[in-house]
């Protein structure tokens, strides 16, 4: 569990929290489209469920291509084209033939999730190739059942938002007995196979192209 060499974030508060936890050797407050490092500086990069929150991806991918060495790996994960369609409340309205309410809910959930992109691999391949990357491999994960746990966790977790605002902690009593029901509800989703044919997220392995 060695700390990553550099972490980037435009939001200072979570960046300082990550810094305090020792997640990064160096935490840098910056936009991903303005990385303050020279060309071909890094040998690899990772993005864990971040790119879907960035409205303009092209400048970010171009900047990432600039600071990565030729042949460097770029690994990331994002929600895919199945994400919105698998939301349980949206499907509930669809089954009642209230499609307009289902669409309204999907827009609402996408908004509170701060998603700008829930795209398929072909869309990502096009973006990546345009920025000088090649797609090495990808697979889907996180089943619709797991998404339902995540979806409802947003609502049942609202009291934790209050404790976070009041005391800076998501979990006030982090003990096994106090988290018994949380564990019971989430364990099946947590232990599911890592590759899911109908998964609503996609994991990508890419690398920066080596120019001939």
Language-model region placement:
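Residue-level detector of flexible, active-site-proximal loop/helix-junction positions
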Residues: 34, 142-145, 210
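Conserved SAM-binding loop
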Residues: 1-88, 204-208
């Amino acid at each position: 569990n060695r700390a990553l060499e550099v972490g980037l974030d435009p939001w200072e508060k979570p960046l300082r929290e990550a810094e305090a936890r020792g997640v990064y050797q160096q935490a840098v407050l910056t936009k991903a489209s303005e990385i303050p490092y020279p060309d071909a500086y890094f040998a690899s990069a990772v993005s864990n469920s971040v790119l879907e929150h960035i409205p303009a991806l092209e400048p970010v991918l171009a900047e990432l291509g600039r600071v990565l060495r030729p042949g460097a790996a770029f690994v990331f994960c994002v929600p895919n084209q199945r994400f919105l369609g698998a939301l349980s409340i949206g499907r509930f309205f669809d089954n009642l033939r209230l499609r307009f309410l289902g669409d309204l809910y999907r827009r609402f959930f996408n908004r509170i999730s701060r998603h700008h992109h829930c795209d398929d691999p072909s869309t990502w391949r096009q973006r990546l190739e345009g920025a000088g990357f090649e797609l090495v491999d990808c697979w889907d994960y996180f089943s619709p059942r797991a998404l339902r746990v995540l979806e409802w966790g947003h609502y049942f977790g609202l009291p934790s938002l209050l404790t976070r605002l009041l005391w800076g902690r998501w979990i006030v009593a982090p003990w096994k007995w106090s988290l018994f029901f949380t564990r019971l509800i989430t364990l099946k989703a947590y232990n599911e196979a890592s590759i899911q044919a109908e998964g609503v997220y996609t994991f990508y392995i890419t690398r920066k192209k080596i120019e001939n």
